[in-house]
Amino acid sequence: MRKSLALILLFAFCSYGSDSTIDEPTQSSASSNIKELVYEDTTGTMVNVDLTNKKTLVVFWADYWGICREELPLLEENLATISENYNVIALAHSNKNSTMTWVSENLNGELEIGFSTSELRDSLKIIGQPISIIFDTDGSILLREYGYVPSDL
């Protein structure tokens, strides 16, 4: 997971202050753009993310998965830098009560936390977690990183 996060951070830092763009999505990305990104926030309200203002990093995670529990504090530590160029959202696919307990005990409240919907998971073919996806402002997938990659490889 640390290597996955490192790749995402590298991607974020490399595009920071750069006028270059990524012309084509990665090979592992979905073939079409998403029309909307809707999730449930921690109060139960459905939120439609504005993808047009800047690129969006979405991390699909679960509080019961150790590698996810390692990644989110690291993501939150680097949030100030990443959020200069990216909307950042962590969407849980786990029990709301246990997720919110874990979040309150392990995070500082800076990272936007929500819950993925079955429609969103189906449209993006999310079958497990952690999965990190970076969306361009047109809804196309620029980067899709699956699971844990040992940092010593």
Where are these regions (language model features)?
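Short, internal strand/loop/helix patches
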Residues: 104-137
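N-terminal targeting signals for export/organelle localization
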Residues: 1-38, 143-153
